[in-house]
Regions:
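Feature responds to low-complexity, polar/acidic, surface-exposed segments characteristic
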Residues: 1-14, 18-46, 57-77, 83-126, ...
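BRCT (BRCA1 C-terminal) phosphopeptide-binding modules in DNA damage response/checkpoint, repair
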Residues: 50, 54-56
Length: 146
């Protein structure tokens, strides 16, 4: 069931990005290296560990450890940064907005300029499956042009 209005967990969006770009995952991964490893679903550990090793994700602090937070809904800004790390789009002029976090500005600007990131998205809001599908379709179309 697609359920277009439900939020996309961070781990699922990462797996979608890696499938889209043909990124091979490590085999036999039992641990990701993140402080919340026990909460990361077994099916996604290879994706998370591979992306961490390749520098495509870095996690964030929960006050006690660096965590990936695989089950939490990914925000639009986080999705832009994650997808951008796999696509490596051409740099674009920074968008002027008080709503784009500084750490996501380059990714949001680049993906917006190439039509992957929907202009005017709420960067702080979790993305839905429909929004993720729209972003990934834009990314697929961008990859086909290369």
């Amino acid at each position: 069931l697609f359920d277009p209005d439900s939020n996309v967990p961070r781990g699922e969006f990462l797996a979608m990005c890696m499938h889209l770009t043909g990124t091979e995952t490590l085999q036999g991964v039992l641990s990701t290296g993140f402080g919340d490893d026990m909460q990361i679903p077994a099916w996604s550990k290879a994706y998370v560990a591979t992306a961490l090793m390749n520098g495509d994700v870095c996690g964030c602090s929960d006050g006690t450890a660096i965590v990936f937070d695989a089950q939490r809904g990914i925000t639009a800004a986080e999705a832009a940064v994650m997808l951008s790390s796999f696509l490596e789009p051409s740099p674009a002029a920074a968008l002027e907005s008080d709503y784009i976090p500084e750490w996501a500005c380059a990714a949001v600007s680049s993906l917006t300029s190439c039509g992957v990131y929907p202009d005017g998205s709420d960067c702080a809001a979790p993305i839905t499956r429909a929004e993720a599908a729209q972003m990934l379709l834009g990314a697929y179309e961008l990859l086909q042009k290369r």
